[in-house]
């Protein structure tokens, strides 16, 4: 029997390890406040620039991979829980809690990613995530409206709740207090007020 399949598996594991090391290095460079560049990430990961380009294609591809890693480690993969709650208000609360937890866990790096996006040097795909949050809120608020709270379904409510669940709002509102156990109920109280869920 040929050892080739085993060697291919070892190679795949090595490639995954290199990819993870590069993403980790990118996160470290972002948090450090140093200028974010492929060179800086490659140096920190101990690989050649070409290796970074080979794995991610572009700087934007690398930033997108960083955001995917943050989403995974920050709990955004739990978002389906918000849509499976029998009570749509409980679903909205779960949605808010998941985002507040994510923002709290990755606050510093999200500030840097948002700054890069504002400067036009961030991942183009990073901006596509906010419309996904809007879509999720649209579904949840429509469910609440259909359950007899018609005011929750208005466009004004949707846009206000969208603003209240943004990282920019969370970052300002939380101040020095980033504990999601403290911030989440305060954000949810504002969401309840705006959506007429008192």
Regions found by a protein language model. Give the residues of each.
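Basic, helix-initiating cap at the start of DNA-binding domains
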Residues: 1-44, 60-61
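Hydrophobic alpha-helical connector segments
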Residues: 65, 78-104
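Short hydrophobic/aromatic patch on the recognition helix
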Residues: 47-56
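Amphipathic alpha-helical packing segments from all-alpha helical-bundle domains
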Residues: 97, 101-108, 114, 121-148, ...
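Short glycine/proline-centered loop/turn elements that form peptide/ligand docking sites
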Residues: 35-37, 59, 147-153
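Short helix-capping/turn signature of helix-turn-helix
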Residues: 56, 115-120, 167
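Generic hydrophobic, amphipathic alpha-helix propensity
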Residues: 14-26, 41, 51, 66-70, ...
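Alpha-helical DNA-contacting segments of helix-turn-helix folds
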Residues: 29-30, 61-70, 110-113, 129
């Amino acid at each position: 029997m040929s050892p080739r399949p085993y060697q291919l598996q070892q190679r795949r594991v090595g490639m995954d390890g290199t990819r993870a090391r590069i993403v980790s290095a990118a996160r470290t460079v972002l948090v450090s406040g140093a200028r974010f560049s492929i060179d800086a990430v490659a140096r920190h990961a101990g690989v050649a620039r070409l290796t970074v380009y080979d794995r991610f294609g572009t700087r934007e591809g690398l930033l997108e991979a960083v955001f995917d890693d943050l989403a995974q480690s920050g709990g955004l993969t739990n978002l389906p829980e918000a849509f499976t709650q029998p009570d749509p208000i409980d679903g909205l609360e779960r949605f808010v809690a998941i985002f507040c937890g994510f923002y709290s866990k990755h606050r510093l790096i999200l500030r840097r990613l948002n700054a890069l996006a504002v400067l036009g040097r961030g991942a183009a795909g990073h901006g596509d995530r906010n419309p996904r949050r809007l879509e999720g809120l649209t579904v949840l608020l429509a469910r609440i409206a259909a359950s007899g709270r018609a005011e929750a379904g208005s466009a004004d409510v949707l846009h206000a709740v969208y603003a209240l669940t943004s990282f920019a709002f969370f970052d300002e509102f939380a101040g020095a207090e980033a504990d999601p156990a403290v911030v989440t109920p305060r954000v949810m109280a504002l969401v309840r007020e705006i959506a007429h869920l008192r």
